[in-house]
Amino acid sequence: MAINAQEISALIKKQIENFQPNFDVTETGVVTYIGDGIARARGLDNAMSGELLEFSNGAFGMAQNLESNDVGIIILGEFSTIREGDVVKRTGKIMEVPVGEALIGRVVNPLGQPVDGLGDIATTGFRPVEAVAPGVMQRKSVSEPLQTGLKAIDALVPIGRGQRELIIGDRQTGKTSVAIDAILNQKGQDMICIYVAIGQKESTVRTQVETLRRYGALDYTIVVTASASQPSPLLFIAPYAGVAMAEEFMYQGKHVLIVYDDLSKQAVAYRELSLLLRRPPGREAYPGDVFYLHSRLLERSAKVSDDLGGGSITALPFIETQAGDISAYIATNVISITDGQIFLQESLFNSGIRPAIDAGSSVSRVGGSAQIKAMKKVAGTLRLDLASYRELEAFTQFGSDLDAATQAKLNRGRRTVEILKQPLHKPLPVEKQVVILYALTHGFLDDVPVNDILAFEEALYDYFDMHYSHLFETIRTTKDLPEEKDLDDAIKAFKDQANFN
């Protein structure tokens, strides 16, 4: 049998042309140190800052310290099975989280994995956890109100869509309750809410989730949780994961409310990571970039321009103070970043004034532009009235005789304090807030005993719902007050048939 050299040559050439190389080139390194959620690895010379790295046990890490001879890595998950000498490889991808509507109604960890036992989440999109905030020309000024349903906030420290309003106070002063009530009040307001629980007890998070479910608020809410028992890298990354999920909706032209509960615990987790990564400590052992930790997070909340869809992210970050000290390091940092703060005072809370908002120390830098006309008219003098009442109340401790004008101010002040009280998880629509504040500022409550104020308020709402619902409708649709005569007549008619004098 003759061998045809040309055929063999053609066959070999064809095989060479059709050859598909089947191999992967990955840059790998070796773990040189492991402990406390931190790893160090040699050999990853081209790793990027914030890059996702994969360990041989399947766990993922994030490159943080890029040094001349090794890389400092924070481990996002189980690290007890990682050993020195294990292989760690680059993925070539920056840390991302799943985003999209499929997350709504679910409880997830900072990596976007479900922790509520309701099965997998069919998300299709991803966004990087670290992203550049919208620039100056990509933003619009805050002009639309975000109604929290709490009279003390909507009247005294109004919040607008796209604003960052800090909620600050000692532990157990009702910070979480304020945020949960604000989420409950977004029902039917075309708003998506994200509640980020950082370093909370798992039982506490479960309670908040059940509250949201009971009031039907979980239908438009995503809960991101990094509990106290989880490694500090997850606590550090949780707020960034939450805001990445929010940005997806914002750039689709939707409105988002995001609650960070609380950033003090994130700062402590970041301090822990930084010290373990051997970064130089600064004041109170926090690293030098702890301001940037929070500023780059909160700057991502904005009201974006119409060219970008006109969506918004409104942020309610929490800071926990020690003994009411709002001049502490992290507290002053976040106060300077945000557009105002709501200060909750322990003494007010313990004396039964809830929400325990200190009107003197609380401020909204957006102010009246985030209020409807009707609220602006009825709440205009409320803050001054409250401040002068507090001042006069301090003087009356000395028991001096009071003239009629001073007595009238004190009486009005006591009724103002009562009106601003509100039961837990009972947010009020803005039209009801406007009517009761109108009744207060126009003297209709001056002859009602202080102990009967809350009963008077409930009865007034019921009476208006039955007989004057068109006045509520007018406020809701026009955002302005109805004719003063109509309101006066309606309140007088209620007082004539009710026995509160």
Swiss-Prot record:
Keyword Protein transport in record: no
Membrane topology: Peripheral membrane protein
Binding residue positions for ATP: 169-176
E.C. number: 7.1.2.2
Alphabetized InterPro entries for the sequence: ATP_synth_asu-like_sf (IPR023366), ATP_synth_asu_C (IPR000793), ATP_synth_asu_C_sf (IPR038376), ATP_synth_F1_a_nt-bd_dom (IPR033732), ATP_synth_F1_asu (IPR005294), ATPase_F1/V1/A1_a/bsu_N (IPR004100), ATPase_F1/V1/A1_a/bsu_N_sf (IPR036121), ATPase_F1/V1/A1_a/bsu_nucl-bd (IPR000194)
A GO CC annotation given for this chain: plasma membrane
Molecular function terms, GO-annotated: ADP binding; ATP binding; proton-transporting ATP synthase activity, rotational mechanism
Cellular compartment(s): Cell membrane
Reactions that this protein is recorded to catalyse: ATP + H2O + 4 H(+)(in) = ADP + phosphate + 5 H(+)(out)
Domain of life: Bacteria
Keywords: ATP synthesis, ATP-binding, Cell membrane, CF(1), Hydrogen ion transport, Ion transport, Membrane, Nucleotide-binding, Translocase, Transport
Function: Produces ATP from ADP in the presence of a proton gradient across the membrane. The alpha chain is a regulatory subunit.
Subunit structure and binding partners: F-type ATPases have 2 components, CF(1) - the catalytic core - and CF(0) - the membrane proton channel. CF(1) has five subunits: alpha(3), beta(3), gamma(1), delta(1), epsilon(1). CF(0) has three main subunits: a(1), b(2) and c(9-12). The alpha and beta chains form an alternating ring which encloses part of the gamma chain. CF(1) is attached to CF(0) by a central stalk formed by the gamma and epsilon chains, while a peripheral stalk is formed by the delta and b chains.
The protein, known as: ATP synthase subunit alpha
Organism: Streptococcus uberis (strain ATCC BAA-854 / 0140J)
